[in-house]
Curated annotation (Swiss-Prot):
Residues 1-23, 121-153 are annotated as: Disordered. PANTHER family: RIBOSOMAL PROTEIN S9 (PTHR21569), SMALL RIBOSOMAL SUBUNIT PROTEIN US9M (PTHR21569:SF1). Pfam families: Ribosomal_S9. Residues 129-138 have a biased composition (Basic and acidic residues). Residues 1-19 have a biased composition (Low complexity). GO terms for molecular function: RNA binding; structural constituent of ribosome. The lineage of its organism: Bacteria, Bacillati, Actinomycetota, Actinomycetes, Pseudonocardiales. Keywords: Ribonucleoprotein, Ribosomal protein. Signal peptide: none annotated. This is Small ribosomal subunit protein uS9. It comes from Saccharopolyspora erythraea (strain ATCC 11635 / DSM 40517 / JCM 4748 / NBRC 13426 / NCIMB 8594 / NRRL 2338). The gene is rpsI.
Length: 153
């Protein structure tokens, strides 16, 4: 049996989901980054390029210049080093893990603010979670893979 032509079809056209609306300018953006055992929560606020990491400046918290450069990399890639202030809470892991987690969190926040930055950050590998973890120690071995010295006789 067919429905009369003047009736509406049984399935209505569903509204098409819009792309995620960008965060309005001037509003802080919060994101999370993880690497190894480190978890970092970042608030990105329009400002002049300041860093507050657990209440300390970037130079105090990360005295290593390599880590400082790694952390600023997402802002340098999208050419906005002087545009945002970064406030972050860092927990767990060591300096290397925390620096990597902070880098990822900043990159995610930049994408949330402006989706046009995504291709550049993705190409630079800043939006990809580094899934490498410490391998567990096995019994009978000295470390994860290091075996005790073997003597044939």
């Amino acid at each position: 049996m067919t429905a009369p032509a003047d009736e509406a079809p049984a399935v209505e056209d569903a509204p098409v989901a819009e792309d995620i609306a960008p965060v309005p300018a001037g509003r802080p953006v919060q994101t999370v980054g993880r690497r190894k055992e480190a978890v970092v929560r970042v608030r990105l606020v329009p400002g002049n390029g300041g860093f507050k990491l657990n209440g300390k400046s970037l130079e105090q918290y990360f005295p290593n210049k390599v880590h400082q450069q790694l952390i600023k990399e997402p802002l340098v890639t999208v050419e906005r080093v002087e545009s945002f202030d970064v406030a972050a809470t860092l927990r767990g892991g060591g300096p290397s893990g925390q620096a990597g987690a902070l880098r990822m969190a900043i990159a995610r926040a930049l994408v949330e603010l402006d989706a046009d930055d995504r291709p550049a950050l993705k190409k630079a590998g800043m939006l990809t979670r580094d899934s490498r973890e410490k391998e567990r120690k096995k019994y009978g071995l000295k470390k994860a893979r290091k075996a005790p010295q073997y003597s044939k006789r």
